[in-house]
Amino acid sequence: MAEEVYDGAIGIDLGTTYSCVAVYEGTNVEIIANEQGNFTTPSFVSFTENERLIGEAAKNQAAMNPANTIFDVKRLIGRRFDDPTVKKDMESWPFKVVDDNGNPKVEVQYLGQTHTFSPQEISAMVLTKMKEIAETKLGKKVEKAVITVPAYFNDNQRQATKDAGAIAGLNVLRIINEPTAAAIAYGLGSGKSDKERNVLIYDLGGGTFDVSLLNIQGGVFTVKATAGDTHLGGQDFDTNLLEYCKKEFTRKTKKDLSGDARALRRLRTACERAKRTLSSGAQTTIEIDSLFDGEDFNIQITRARFEDLNAKAFAGTLEPVAQVLKDAGIEKHQVDEIVLVGGSTRIPRIQKLLSEFFDGKKLEKSINPDEAVAYGAAVQAGILSGKATSADTSDLLLLDVVPLSLGVAMEGNIFAPVVPRGQTVPTIKKRTFTTVADNQQTVQFPVYQGERVNCEDNTLLGEFTLAPIPPMKAGEPVLEVVFEVDVNGILKVTATEKTSGRSANITIANSVGKLSTDEIEKMISDAEKFKSKDEAFSKRFEAKQQLESYISRVEEIISDPTLSLKLKRGQKDKIEQALSEAMAQLEIEDSTADELKKKELALKRLVTKAMASR
């Protein structure tokens, strides 16, 4: 690869099921195709005895290697092992998730050994793949990127995504919210207008769901409110159809395939395909030969059946829509445009429900739902790296918001919000607290994110201690807590005791699900090692193929009476000896590419010498 470094930055939509990469130069955004010519790449990583596969290659062999093929990692990133959604997902995942001090990690067999990887490392592998797709197109090394996350991601999930970027060797210029990125794609693509518009972005992807209401005027994109579910998407619709098919299989055959990971993977793939077909057709057939225990499976699925199986999930997507309107303080009729983003918005029933919610309003489908988020990320990347020269982007300004309130726990585990949800970022907010006991010299500050009164119902982001503070009567010390949220939506908290001036702070980076600088550096070095192992395997495979091909040609020469006559006297034995050595080298499992090439070269020299005119 060319060592010249690209002076711009790329935009990456790191999706639950598929990822997409784009670049913005001058006045054009280009969505970059992978080596198969597809504009989206599966967010899959697979491990085998010999190599690591990422993207299309990983997904294509998932049924053959279910326990070592990782997907849905976006549903693990920044979460605790004991998170109820993690527990629920583990029931349907064919790969193993283990508890590492409260952090979930995936366990796989790779290169003949057991390895565990954090969600950040797996995400980094997908990001590396997207980076390489861009590098192939640009012919230069890429070092900078803007990465998107669901608007409803909490602080832990945002920081973990930023860490994944660092492990992939990327300087993450900005983390931006997916619906905001899609709004940029829509706002620029629909021709910039100075007319003020209220635009609702309905973003339903493979694993996450966001609704954002933006006010767009000229180049200013102001997020008024956001809501969503970081655990709802196409994967869940597939799962509901899968569960139905499992029951039907058991009803027809009296056999239970629940424990067979390969059968489940094949069935899930068929269900995903059926779901896509039903977006345009009224019915489809799922047909799988010898699905389990020699039994074939054949079932007809109508669109009505699929809609019925997912009725609750589909209807549930309207709750965040209502929430966003309420938070933004606007009525349905004040929404000018409703923009569909994410592959799952192709489902006709979802479109119908959303249109009916807005009293039959026409939905906006002018942007590609799979590519819009990467498009917007690329525009932001172009602006931040100085590559965007278009008049459309010269005055582009993004004003995003905090999706969930941030605060601390008070006595009785009551949540005290400091930064309310919907607050524009970046922001700094202060709140004053005091002590609850006489002569108290230590104060704990557990930091939470959420909307519930009881802190246990919110997400613990981390905690820190302010000590020692001067002994005083309860209620006398003045403890000022400052919350700073940066443009990436990442939080830093500082507490100061005003009389002594003593302070303590935390950039939420050491709690569960977070990585220390040392851990990130180790993961970067591991990622480099795995990359070099991948490259060595590819080179070895190529050298092996070339040697095998050349051996076949030489065998043809010495076994063909006419051709063998052209060999110099006494040379045939030497060639046969070299052939034996080359074949022996092929049998050695850990032969390097260099060793294989040397055998090929030695054989070529002998043949060339023997074929020389006498």
Swiss-Prot record:
Q: Where is the region Lid domain (SBDalpha)?
A: 517-613
The role this protein plays is:
Ribosome-bound, Hsp70-type chaperone that assists in the cotranslational folding of newly synthesized proteins in the cytosol. Stimulates folding by interacting with nascent chains, binding to short, largely hydrophobic sequences exposed by unfolded proteins, thereby stabilizing longer, more slowly translated, and aggregation-prone nascent polypeptides and domains that cannot fold stably until fully synthesized. The Hsp70-protein substrate interaction depends on ATP-binding and on allosteric regulation between the NBD and the SBD.
Q: Which organism is it from?
A: Chaetomium thermophilum (strain DSM 1495 / CBS 144.50 / IMI 039719)
Subcellular compartments:
Cytoplasm
Show the GO MF annotations.
ATP binding; ATP hydrolysis activity; ATP-dependent protein folding chaperone
Protein residues bound to ATP: 16-18, 74, 206-208, 272-279, 343
Q: Which Gene3D superfamilies does the annotation name?
A: 1.20.1270.10, 3.30.30.30, 3.30.420.40, Actin, Chain A, domain 4, Substrate Binding Domain Of DNAk, Chain A, domain 1
The GO biological-process annotations, alphabetized, read as: translation
Q: Which UniProt keywords apply?
A: ATP-binding, Chaperone, Cytoplasm, Hydrolase, Nucleotide-binding, Protein biosynthesis
What is the annotated quaternary arrangement, including any partners? Binds to ribosomes. Binds close to the ribosomal tunnel exit via contacts with both ribosomal proteins and rRNA. Directly interacts with nascent polypeptides. This interaction is dependent on the ribosome-associated complex (RAC). Interacts with SSE1. Interacts with FES1.
> Enzyme class, one word?
hydrolase
The record's listing under Pfam families reads: HSP70 (PF00012)
Q: Which reaction does it catalyse?
A: ATP + H2O = ADP + phosphate + H(+)
Where is the segment annotated Nucleotide binding domain (NBD)? Answer: 1-392
In the Enzyme Commission scheme, what number(s) does this protein have? 3.6.4.10
Q: Does the keyword Nucleotide-binding apply?
A: yes
Where the record places motif Nuclear export signal is 575-583
From the UniProt entry, list the residue stretches annotated as the region Inter-domain linker: 393-403
Protein name stated in the entry: Ribosome-associated molecular chaperone SSB1
Q: Provide a GO CC annotation, any one.
A: cytoplasm
Q: According to its UniProt record, which protein family does this protein belong to?
A: Belongs to the heat shock protein 70 family. Ssb-type Hsp70 subfamily.
Please name the NCBIfam families in this protein's record. PRK00290.1
Substrate binding domain (SBD): annotated span: 404-614
